[in-house]
Each structure stands twice: as structure tokens, then as C-alpha cells.
Amino acid sequence: MTWSTSFLSVHFFAFITTSIHAQLTGSVGPLTSVSDKAAVKTCNVLDYGARSDNTTDVGQPIIDAFADCGSGGLIYIPEGDYLLKNWISLENGSAWAIQLDGVLYRDSSPSSQSYMFEISGGRDFELFSSNATGAIQGSGYLYHRDDTYTGPRMLHISGVSDWSVHDLVLVDSPMFHFVIDGGYNGEVYNMAIRGADHGGLDGIDVYGDNMWIHDIMVTNKDECVTTKTNSHNFLIENIYCNSSGGCAIGSLGSGANVSNIVYRNVYTWDSNQMMMIKSNGGSGDVSNAVFENFIGHGNAYSLDLDSYWSSMDAIDGDGIYYHNITFQNWTGTAVDGETRPPIRVICPEDTPCTEIALVQIDLWVEEGGYDEYICKNAYGSGYCLDSATGTSTPYTTTTYVNSAPTGYEAPTMTDDLATAFGTSASIPIPTIPASFFPGVTPISAVAGSS
């Protein structure tokens, strides 16, 4: 254990040079443009029996339109309010798109845990709003007010390649908002996801290969944008966790397999953590990851790699091997750096972490008089990490810092929520913000913006 009145950051590590470039391996998104798809055929759901009266079911008209346009064409849902009675499951489409300019409202039935809107298989797909006001309203509060958090999930992309989802709003799902299983060459951007202040209402959960997720705002109290196992070559940037659970990798169990992941430009406000990598036992490998340019305010935890995460049951195995992972350029404040250390790197005793880099982590407390940093069985460079190599001797180092680091102060965002949304009343549909990270404009202009 050490005590210091100042803390010296290490600004350069030889082994981070290659890891910082880990991201995409090729092009992402649809193979053909929306205009080309529309030129083949356009299927307006109003021609298939839909009505913008929030009474007539729009689910079956969308399914019927897919029969005509799912092998080449555009399904068009005009502005207006539509009732979603029949859940939508569309499979193995090609060269097709859905333009959702209206708002879909979940009907009170069915009540199963299945997905309200599911796209599986196929390739060259796009789901978007041309005016950035297209939305799905899940009315999850009708479950949550009765303390029920098991129910329908909202949007699911499964086994699709060369695709995108953008300029949409997802609101108040009874359970998970957006799940991506086996997404390949996909792009997700310009979205606002807003859920209740409770666990189990994940924003985006994703696994796959060659994925670009950017310019996303999430409000809930669970996963913001979280990478699951079997994920490779991800670039996740310009993320706004606005009173959320925060971003994460995990939770990870047996046979974990995650590599070449970049999170950058992540802004986290009033959330559970800025970034958490979580496991408890298990096996496998997480490697070649970079977490850079993080800003946080009012969060419970900040930088948290926890291989003994107590919120999941322990899994058989010596632990996941975490290696070649860099955290750099973090600024802002934590609620209480004494009881919840802003730096926590807790690695398995039998499978120590190696090649970990902590670079310019400038975080300070909002309450209390000092920061606490804790590293356990973690080897690399910076802060409380042990620089030794070739050893597996268990260790724990706790460092106390009683003066604020230079440069910890960081900007806030105008859309920061003063209070979270509860669980007993309808959550209003938000506007997609003009920015998702301080001083940075969206990579692609939000639809309909001037």
C-alpha cells in the first residue's frame, strides 16, 4: 500500500501502439442505396391495410409488405401513429429496407418475452427514419408499475450481414431495447434509446464481427452499449450514456472470445460506471482493446475491470485472460472515490492480466477528500499496476491520492438529465440530440437536420 500527495501518470507505453489501431476490418452497412431499393419496388403499408389511427394493427401489413419487397425494395411506413398488435419477424431478406417515419405503439398483447420487431438472416438491409422522428414506443411502464421486468423485447437483428439501423428512437421497452446477435458488417448510428430507471432494460447488447456503432444516446439503468462474447473488430464511438448503467464488456463466462475492440469518445452522466469489464471465473480470452477519450460525471464507478464480479454467480474455470488492453485519456469526476475507487483493475489470481496500460487517467471525487486506486494481479504500466513480467505471484496494490490531478475538469452536455425516468408513468419520446460527445458533431448528419 502506498500514499502520495500527487500521482505521476505514465504517458507512453511501447505495447499500446498496435492495439490502438484495432477496429474495423472492412466496409460496413448496406450494399445498395435506399434510392436503388425504392426504384425496384416501394411497398407502402397503407396499401396493405395499415391505418395511422393507433387502433388498426400495423404488424400484419408490414409482414405482407415484406412478402412483396423483402427480396428487393423499400417498405414505407409514413408519418403517423400505428398500433403494433402482431409482432414482426422477417427472415432472409435481400437488398431491402424499411423506412419508419411514423411511431409504432406496442399493443397490450401479446405478453411473451419475444421481440416486437425482429430481422433475421439475409443481407443488404437498412432500417431507418428519413426525418429522425420514427420511433417504437414500448409502453414498458405498464409492466414496470407492477414491479414486472419480464416481458416483450423491442428490436432484434440476428445473423444479418451488410446492414444498418439509424436515425430511430426506441422508448420504454418492457425488457431489452436493442439486441444484435451475430451482426456482421453492420452500422448503427444516430439513435436515442430511452428506458426506465431499472436494471434489465438494456440499451444495446451486441456481438458479431466488423461492427461500427456511433452517435448513440442511451437512458436506462443497465447496459448502455455493451459488447458480448464472440465479438471482434468493433469500433464504438461518440456514445452518450445519459443516466444509464454505462458501457461494458460482458458479463463473460466460459469460452469468452473478444478481440480488437475500440471504444472512444464516450460521455457518461449519472450512471453506474463509465466502463466495466465483468466476469467471475470462467475461461477464454479478451485481447487487443482500447478505451480512449472518456468523460464522466456523477458516476458510481469509473474504470472498472472486475474478474470477481459479485453480481453474477461464479463459473468454473481459472478466469478469463485479459491482455493487451489500454485505457487512456479519461477525465471527469466520480461520486465517491473513497468507497468506489475510480480505478479498479481486479484480475484472476490464477490467470493474471498482462499488457495492461493506464494512460492519463485524470478523475477526481465529488464527495470525500481523496481517490483510491486498486489493482490486483494486473501487470503492465501506469498507476497501481505492477510492472513485473513473467510472474504469477498474487498481489494487491492500493494507492491513495489526496490531491486532484491536473486536467480532471471536463465539459458537460446540454442534454444531461436532471432526474431519471421512473417506472410508473409513460416515458416521452425524445429528440435525437445534436451531439453525443462534447465538441463533436455526429459522423453522419442526423436525418432532417439542416
Swiss-Prot record:
GO terms for cellular component: extracellular region. The active site is at 222 (proton donor), 297. It comes from the Eukaryota. One of its GO terms (molecular function) is polygalacturonase activity. It is found in: Secreted. Pfam families: Glyco_hydro_28 (PF00295). Its EC number is 3.2.1.-. Glycans are attached at residues 54, 92, 131, 242, 257, 324, 329. Keywords: Carbohydrate metabolism, Cell wall biogenesis/degradation, Disulfide bond, Glycoprotein, Glycosidase, Hydrolase, Polysaccharide degradation, Secreted, Signal. The keyword Glycoprotein applies. Residues 1-22 form the signal peptide. It is an enzyme of class 3 (hydrolase). Disulfide bonds join 43-69, 224-241, 347-353, 375-384. GO terms for biological process: cell wall organization; polysaccharide catabolic process. SUPFAM superfamilies: Pectin lyase-like (SSF51126). Pectinolytic enzymes consist of four classes of enzymes: pectine lyase, polygalacturonase, pectin methylesterase and rhamnogalacturonase. Hydrolyzes alpha-D-galacturonopyranosyl-(1,2)-alpha-L-rhamnopyranosyl linkages in the backbone of the hairy regions of pectins. PANTHER family: PECTIN LYASE SUPERFAMILY PROTEIN-RELATED (PTHR31736:SF19), PTHR31736. Belongs to the glycosyl hydrolase 28 family. This is Probable rhamnogalacturonase E. It comes from Aspergillus niger.
